[in-house]
Structure formats: C-alpha cells, structure tokens
C-alpha cells in the first residue's frame, strides 16, 4: 500500500480506506451472488498466514492488537470452474470448520464430491453440514523422497 501511495500521490490512509471499502464490496457481492451453485467436485483447503505477527511471537510483541497471530483462510473451490464457492478468514478449530461447512453446503444445489485434507475438524463439520448427502474423501498428503515403482 505504501508503494501505491508513492506512485499515485494519494495518502496512505486514503489507500487503506479504499482497500477496506473494496474488500467489503467484494464480500457483499460474493455473498449475494455465489448461491445456487451446481458443482460436481469441491476441493477444500485452508491457507495459513498471520496478522501482525506469528502466534508464537504475540506475547512478546509490542502493542499487538486484538486478533494478532495465526490467521487461516478457509476455501472451497469448484474443481472444474475454479470458482471460489465459499471462504472464511479466522482460526483453525472446529467452530470455524462447522461454520464454514454450513456456508459451503448452503451455496450448493446438488450432491457433490467433497475432498479435504485430514484436519480432524472436517469429519464432524462435513457430517453436520451435509449429513449423508455428500460423497466425502480425505486426501492424505505424503511428503518425502519419491519411490518409483517399475512395472
């Protein structure tokens, strides 16, 4: 934002307010228009970031604001169209998982194949939001040295 301020000559506060207003407008547009989605495959994941400082440094940070620390952006993506069906910014616990999955389910019109990682909070959240009206899979990500199998 400082670079935008320097390039445009607009004050940093003006740029900040514009970004906040644009974000609110985009969120309202998404909430009102991304409904009744007919999708076949939904991929779910979360992205880690931090607000002000990493969680481990919040206690020693100078004047850390409320909400400082780890921040997670939950996303639900239509695997075919790449539409973000739903998103949520917050923590990574079961209360956020439940709220997020309820929102995802409310935006869909049909039974979907839903894929998540193995975060334990998903099991209860998916069942609570979709009941039995979902084909659910957890993708286990395996890291490390690859082994090639010759046939």
Regions found by a protein language model. Give the residues of each.
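Short, positively charged, Gly/Tyr-enriched micro-motifs
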Residues: 1-37, 47-50, 79-83, 91-95, ...
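Short conserved beta-strand segments at catalytic cores or DNA/RNA-binding microdomains
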Residues: 61-93, 101-102
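Conserved small/polar residues in nucleotide/adenosyl-binding loops
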Residues: 149-151
């Amino acid at each position: 934002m400082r670079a935008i301020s320097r390039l445009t000559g607009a004050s940093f506060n003006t740029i900040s307010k514009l970004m906040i207003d644009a974000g609110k407008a985009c969120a309202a547009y998404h909430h009102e228009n991304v409904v009744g989605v007919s999708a076949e495959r939904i991929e779910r994941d979360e992205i880690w970031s931090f607000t002000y400082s990493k969680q481990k440094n919040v206690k020693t940070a100078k004047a850390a604001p409320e909400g400082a620390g780890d921040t997670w952006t939950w996303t639900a993506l239509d695997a075919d169209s790449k539409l973000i069906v739903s998103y949520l910014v917050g923590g990574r616990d079961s209360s956020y998982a439940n709220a997020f999955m309820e929102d995802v389910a409310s935006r869909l019109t049909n039974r979907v194949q839903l894929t998540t990682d193995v975060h334990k909070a998903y099991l209860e959240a998916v069942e609570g939001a979709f009941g039995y009206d979902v084909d659910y899979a957890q993708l286990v990500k395996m890291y490390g040295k690859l082994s090639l199998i010759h046939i």
